[in-house]
Amino acid sequence: MSSFWQLLIDIFFPPVCIECRHRISAGMLCTACRKKLQDFRILQPRAYCCPDIESICLFYRYDAGIKKALHEVKFHGKKRLLAAMADEMSILETPKRVCAMWNLPANIVVVPIPTDRKRVAQRGYDVPQGIFSQWSQKQGFVWCEALARIRSTEPQYGLDRSERRKNVRGCFNTIRDIRGKPILLVDDIFTSGATAEEAANILRKQGASHVWAMAFAGGADDDK
């Protein structure tokens, strides 16, 4: 979108905090609500049966305004909120701290978990890509869409953990050479870990040296 049209949108529809509805200049939350809703967590992969992942980081709890915003983006075509989520990644300090804490190598490759092609076609955009691509490039990381879905899957919500793992089993393949490369796997939502582990498993089988995982939100019962 051109800067002129974006300016008009901001004038007539100024951005507001998704939680308290107060005016904001960037991102999707005001400072107070950001402090309230941020739920930075490092998860132990073993607890989620994710042996192919070194460590997992979540930035927001999938609840309240965050959950509503992601639903608006994923099911109601609110692409403008997707841009706000990308801004939010730039505003947050925790992603930078996590990268430093994990001591990620300089040649880290950021790989988004691909959304089912049917859902991308319906929405007109890919949510993980929209949230993380700009952020990764600002960090100086290589952005690489190295994974593709080779079959469609059912939505994960409503399925138990074993059903989710069965649903995504064998749904990914690599479309780029990632042999010997360290990978930072990114997604919009992390819940049971089924999708992330399946993606990490194929990356490791295809030669990735290490895989870390990062998600915008997590901790509820829904998934992709």
Predicted regions and their residues:
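Glycine-rich phosphate/pyrophosphate-handling loop used in enzymes and phosphotransfer proteins
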Residues: M1-D187, T191-K224
